Each structure stands twice: as C-alpha cells, then as structure tokens.
C-alpha cells in the first residue's frame, strides 16, 4: 500500500522550555541526532513526508535540506501555531490537502524504538494519560 508520513513540527514546545526558545523541538538532539531524524529514518527513502512547520520554521526547513537530501518533503507552513485555536489538530488540518493517501502521523517530539510497518488498513492509535489537559484528547 502506498502511503505518506506526516510530522507535526509547528508548535512552540512550551513543555520543553527553556530548550525550545531558540530551537524547534523537532531539532532537539537525542543520542546526538535531531528527534525528527529519528522519525524520518524509520521509513524508506521513497516515502513522501509531509512536515508542518511554524515556530522557527526556517531552522527546520534548513535542517531537512541539509540532513536529508535524499528525501522528498512537502513543507506546510502553519499560520497559527501558538495561542487560541492552535494545536496538533489545527496543524494536521493545515496538512490535509497533501494527505491524499493513507498516512502515518507523528508529533515531532515522539520517539518510537520499534520498526513501523507500512499500513495495511486504516487504524488509530491512542494512549491513556492522567493529565488530559496537557495533551490532545480523544473521547471513545
């Protein structure tokens, strides 16, 4: 099945301050590599990756151009990445015109250690959290 990957890297990373005042949270290093690179490298080079950018967007775009020259990226500039009405849902909606295939969604501050298989069908993964006001929520 052909699919895409969508990475949201638009937010200000408020829970990671002061580290994110001058660097986008997707570029924070983990084991000497930017978080976003850990995500990108989970997928074959022929998979198109849609990246939503906002906060310090130029640094993310420049990094992707330098670190992942062999990849095809579609960059979506999110116009509202802080304040009322912003958030992952809004950023994902800004990407919708570029998500014309099944896709795997990643928040740019999420690391997954396991290999990620291509999607064979539609599914949604969620996880319970205690402090729901700090995260995106889904009512099931």
Regions found by a protein language model. Give the residues of each.
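Short beta-strand-to-loop acidic/aromatic patch adjacent to the donor-nucleotide binding site
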Residues: 101-111
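Short glycine-rich anion-binding loops that position phosphate/pyrophosphate groups of nucleotides
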Residues: 11-13, 81, 109-111
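Conserved N-terminal catalytic core of the sugar/cofactor nucleotidyltransferase
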Residues: 1-7, 15, 29, 33-102
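Conserved core of the sugar-phosphate nucleotidyltransferase
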Residues: 113-140
């Amino acid at each position: 099945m052909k699919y895409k990957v969508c990475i949201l890297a638009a937010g200000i990373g408020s829970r990671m301050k002061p580290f994110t005042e001058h660097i986008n949270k997707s570029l924070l290093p983990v084991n000497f590599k930017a978080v976003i690179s850990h995500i990108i490298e989970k997928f074959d080079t022929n998979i198109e990756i849609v990246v939503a950018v906002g906060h310090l967007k130029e640094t993310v775009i420049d990094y992707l151009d330098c670190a992942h020259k062999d990849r095809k990226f579609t960059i979506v500039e999110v116009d509202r990445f802080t304040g009322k009405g912003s958030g992952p849902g809004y950023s994902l909606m800004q990407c919708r015109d570029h998500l014309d295939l099944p896709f795997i969604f990643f928040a740019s501050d999420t690391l997954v250690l396991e290999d990620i298989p291509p999607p064979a069908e539609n599914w949604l993964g969620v996880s319970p959290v205690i402090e729901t006001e700090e995260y995106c929520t889904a009512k099931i």
